[in-house]
Amino acid sequence: MAQFYTPGRRTATRKILIVTATDLDAFGQGVAREQGKTLFISGLLPGEQAEVILSEEKRHFARGRVTRLISHSPQRVAPRCPHAGVCGGCQQQHAAIALQQQSKSQALQRLMARETGVDIAPQVIAGEPYGYRRRARFGLQFNVKTQRVVLGFRQAASNDLVALKACPVLAPALEALLLPLGECLSALRARRRLGHLELVLADNGPLMVLRHLDPLSLSDREALSAFARQRGLTLYLSDGGAPQRLLGEAPYYQIDGSRLDFNPQDFIQVNAAVNAQMVGQALAWLDVRADERVLDLFCGMGNFTLPLARLALRVVGVEGVPGLVATAQNNARNNGLSNVEFFHQNLEEDVTRQAWASQGFDKILLDPARAGAPGVMQHIVRLAPRRVVYVSCNPTTLARDSQTLLQGGYRLTRLCMLDMFPHTGHLESMALFESAAQ
């Protein structure tokens, strides 16, 4: 009789090491080295020694987490958030803000030096480390056991939600809504069929967008309207389409003397204070004169375009999202700016035949998405502006696109790290390029 042998399941033994961190990467992970291998340890600061367990091991690097902290860095601080370490929203509240900014700035400098050969120490633009976030999107889950709606962010490395009691990175006016909103949503008849919730703090007050999976009953709409009136909220509802305003005023914010109206689904910078500084620094770097023509690529709804139009002879804005182009046109008209023109064009395609592409420009600003702007960089060189300001939410694509400008006769003269998202690993940046022919 044949006998079959089934081997027992192998149990992988995770390595436990004692290491000392020497650095902090841009994502807030401690960097240590063990037998020639680089270790990235979440929760460990430079100078700290800890017992760590490896969660992932590759040939040249490994990742791990702290199981026991042996020594403490003077730059370790107590997180202000009661959910720190569990919530996936912030990763660096245990690190002093100066250390966070230093690590991000150094990471940007190293990357740009390695990829472009230009070594420039970035200036840092930052605001308050807490209370800065004027926009947030929250998941909603119905808890059968408690019969309540859980409102929160995802847990780190999980799809489960953290039931938020507080969120100190939110603007205080938004943070104050968290607990009352949980009560309101838990009392709705549709509480089992809610999608997600967005909160935005406009200059004229907070707004809420509730996305629901089924049509709301009249009683639920009345309950939400009563809550919005009591809290001074503009209320939008969405069943999958564009949000519909049920109550309150359309939102806007002001930037450099211009009022920008926006729709809830429009992109706006999360950090109002850093956005204002960023726009001001970009204008200073471009040094726009009254007789100059300026091009704003990936212009959105006019965050840079309208301030530029107050300085220049003429400004052209190009954007790929039609709704943002319409909003930008309305904003220019409402601000009495007749020297600005907007084009709806796909900047990821060949731009040479697009309507704006044959015009001449003295200065150019671009603010692309994470993928960067490979489709327009060669054309920017052909347009031969005297200065180019590149605003980036991804330093890797900034470094890549910079090479086209450097090879085309431009010099990288200024670099800036924008701490748009304190306590997270997100790094935003801005660079100034000047024509070597000047």
UniProtKB/Swiss-Prot annotation:
Sorted UniProt keywords: 4Fe-4S, Iron, Iron-sulfur, Metal-binding, Methyltransferase, rRNA processing, S-adenosyl-L-methionine, Transferase
Listed GO MF terms: 4 iron, 4 sulfur cluster binding; iron ion binding; RNA binding; rRNA (uridine-C5-)-methyltransferase activity
GO biological process, one term: rRNA base methylation
Active site (catalytic residues): 393
Binding site for [4Fe-4S] cluster: 81, 87, 90, 167
Catalytic activity: uridine(1939) in 23S rRNA + S-adenosyl-L-methionine = 5-methyluridine(1939) in 23S rRNA + S-adenosyl-L-homocysteine + H(+)
PROSITE patterns documented for this protein: SAM_MT_RNA_M5U, TRAM, TRMA_1, TRMA_2
Residue intervals of the TRAM domain: 4-68
Family matches, as Pfam families: TRAM, tRNA_U5-meth_tr
Domain of life from the UniProt record: Bacteria
Top-level EC class as recorded in UniProt: transferase
InterPro entries with a match to the protein in the record: 23S_rRNA_MeTrfase_RlmD, MeTrfase_TrmA_AS, MeTrfase_TrmA_CS, NA-bd_OB-fold, SAM-dependent_MTases_sf, TRAM_dom, U5_MeTrfase_fam
EC number: 2.1.1.190
Annotated binding of S-adenosyl-L-methionine, by residue: 269, 298, 303, 319, 346, 367
PANTHER family per UniProt: 23S RRNA (URACIL(1939)-C(5))-METHYLTRANSFERASE RLMD (PTHR11061:SF49), RNA M5U METHYLTRANSFERASE (PTHR11061)
Main function: Catalyzes the formation of 5-methyl-uridine at position 1939 (m5U1939) in 23S rRNA.
HAMAP family reported in the protein's UniProt record: 23SrRNA_methyltr_RlmD (MF_01010)
Family statement: Belongs to the class I-like SAM-binding methyltransferase superfamily. RNA M5U methyltransferase family. RlmD subfamily.
NCBIfam families given in the database record: PRK13168.1, rumA
Stated name of the protein: 23S rRNA (uracil(1939)-C(5))-methyltransferase RlmD
